[in-house]
Amino acid sequence: MAKVYYEKDVTVNVLKEKKVAIIGYGSQGHAHAQNLRDNGFDVVVGLRKGKSWDKAKEDGFSVYTVAEAAKQADVVMILLPDELQPEVYEEEIAPNLQAGNSLVFAHGFNVHFDQVKPPVNVDVFLVAPKGPGHLVRRTFSEGGAVPALFAVYQDATGVATEKALSYADGIGATRAGVLETTFKEETETDLFGEQAVLCGGVTALVKAGFETLVDAGYQPELAYFECLHELKLIVDLMYEGGLENMRYSVSDTAQWGDFVSGPRVVTEDTKKAMGTVLAEIQDGTFARGWIAEHKAGKPNFYATNEKENEHEIEVVGRKLRGMMPFVQPRVKAGVK
């Protein structure tokens, strides 16, 4: 079982007198920066010129270039997209690190797959909230928190664990609980969850169900409601109380259908395919492919995204969501 730390376990916050540079001011960046500041930390933000720079300024932060922020900080938290981190680290962060500094991540991808190679004289750890930035910020402001993971990759000072827990405490995560892990475990389980279940698995399942109904002659609008729209209702029940709560909350007919039909859809062959996905994550195949795709300008990424956005389920969904003003995306989808 995972070891979990709470507020009572952080008796002395060893980072309170240190300067923390938050590199990036997107979903996680703004939440980390604001939570740390509210908890009395000395926070600066490191960015390239753009909308985020202006937003961080409006929010009252001292904003610098990435290099300037890294140079003056004791703790550098990198909250940029995975594919951008290696270049920014190499050009702007690495030259400004000093012995005893802390290099921090919210995901272990680049360290685990050797895209970022920290010097031996700095602490390296991760603190990864298990929720999007807006939720990290909102729950903190309400007096609660989102649980987080932490892991130490390199302990140059002998107090890297204390630093990691102090950072987690600073963003409020110790209110809910902070689970100890490793860079390897966090990276591989996170990627697997995204690919096999949360993103890849769910989208493939939803599309397959939609296509099955439409191909059988049912109206696309009904297929959308049954296979996509109502998914949130079921996921919310699982989120609140696990599979048991979902099954308790639905009809007996639905629960019996779950028991007799679910295993025929997600079969042993499906689990074998999941095993292959996991193996490709573990041996670096996925990482190498994604890194190569990014370096090539992401042609397949953009082409696939465009094709997926033209699928009938998306066309029907846009139409139906237009009839439901209470269903609005938090962020308008577009080109990344």
UniProtKB/Swiss-Prot annotation:
GO biological process terms held by the UniProt record: isoleucine biosynthetic process; L-valine biosynthetic process
Binding site for substrate: S251
Residues annotated as domain KARI N-terminal Rossmann: 2-181
Pathway assigned in UniProt: Amino-acid biosynthesis; L-isoleucine biosynthesis; L-isoleucine from 2-oxobutanoate: step 2/4; Amino-acid biosynthesis; L-valine biosynthesis; L-valine from pyruvate: step 2/4
Co-factor note (free text): Binds 2 magnesium ions per subunit.
Keywords: Amino-acid biosynthesis, Branched-chain amino acid biosynthesis, Magnesium, Metal-binding, NADP, Oxidoreductase
Coiled-coil regions listed: none
Domain KARI C-terminal knotted span(s) in chain numbering: 182-327
Binding site for Mg(2+) 1: D190, E194
EC number: 1.1.1.86
Binding site for Mg(2+) 2: D190, E226, E230
MF annotations from Gene Ontology: ketol-acid reductoisomerase activity; magnesium ion binding; NADP binding
Residues binding NADP(+), per UniProt: Y25, G26, S27, Q28, R48, S52, D82, E83, L84, Q85, G133
Residues annotated as catalytic: H107
Enzyme class: oxidoreductase
InterPro entries documented for this protein: 6-PGluconate_DH-like_C_sf, KARI, KARI_C, KARI_N, KARI_prok, NAD(P)-bd_dom_sf
Classification via Pfam families: KARI_C, KARI_N
SUPFAM superfamilies in the cross-refs: 6-phosphogluconate dehydrogenase C-terminal domain-like, NAD(P)-binding Rossmann-fold domains
Catalytic activity: (2R)-2,3-dihydroxy-3-methylbutanoate + NADP(+) = (2S)-2-acetolactate + NADPH + H(+); (2R,3R)-2,3-dihydroxy-3-methylpentanoate + NADP(+) = (S)-2-ethyl-2-hydroxy-3-oxobutanoate + NADPH + H(+)
PROSITE patterns: KARI_C, KARI_N
Function (record text): Involved in the biosynthesis of branched-chain amino acids (BCAA). Catalyzes an alkyl-migration followed by a ketol-acid reduction of (S)-2-acetolactate (S2AL) to yield (R)-2,3-dihydroxy-isovalerate. In the isomerase reaction, S2AL is rearranged via a Mg-dependent methyl migration to produce 3-hydroxy-3-methyl-2-ketobutyrate (HMKB). In the reductase reaction, this 2-ketoacid undergoes a metal-dependent reduction by NADPH to yield (R)-2,3-dihydroxy-isovalerate.
HAMAP family the UniProt entry points to: IlvC
PANTHER family per UniProt: KETOL-ACID REDUCTOISOMERASE, MITOCHONDRIAL
Protein name: Ketol-acid reductoisomerase (NADP(+)) 1
Record organism: Bacillus anthracis
Lineage of the species this protein comes from: Bacteria, Bacillati, Bacillota, Bacilli, Bacillales
Recorded name of the encoding gene: ilvC1
